[in-house]
Amino acid sequence: MELETYLPKLEDLWFRKTMLEDEETMSYNHAWGGTVSFPKDRWNDWYQYWVIEDDGQRYYRYLKNEKGVFVGEIAYHYSDFYHGYMANIIIYSKYRHQGYGREGLKILCEVAKENGITYLYDDIAIDNPAISLFLKEGFVEEYRTEEIILLKKQL
């Protein structure tokens, strides 16, 4: 399986909108409200912040499979709350269970390391099945509450 990263253009944000508004894709996000509205009138500001203003605090890319089809997104950003860089990976529901999540997480960790980041974190809902993926990829439990588990990986 071959995955490549792709820096989306503004007009490519239809894919992010599709994922965020898809109930099955966003089921992992139920602890934080599930689906997320991403209307076109918010695209410019979002794109400016995540793509144009590259200050080293954020990274965002789509994942494309060997056929050139968008299958998900990977990102990280600095969190003042956690005092560290938080991972984000979303695989569109119809492309799950095909290894894209594992490969995307590996790519994200490699990019973060290349960009000088030493630790990557993610706070995941306690019942999210993706926890096992993160643990298999070298993340360790930092702590947990009744709602979330905070995972950390030294890069």
Task: For each feature predicted by the language model, list its residue ranges.
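Short strand-connecting beta-turns/loops that link adjacent beta-strands
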Residues: L10, K67-V69, S79-Y82, D127, ...
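Conserved catalytic-core motifs of GNAT/GCN5-like acyltransferases
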Residues: Y121-A125, G138-K153
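Conserved acetyl-CoA-binding loop-helix of GNAT-fold acetyltransferases
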Residues: H97-E110, S132, K136
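A short, well-structured alpha-helix characteristic of acyl/acetyltransferase catalytic modules
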Residues: M1-K40, N44
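Amphipathic alpha-helical recognition patches that constitute DNA-binding helices
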Residues: F15, M86, I90, E103-G104, ...
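Conserved beta-strand-loop-alpha-helix junction that forms the acyl-donor binding cleft
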Residues: Y92, Y121-S132
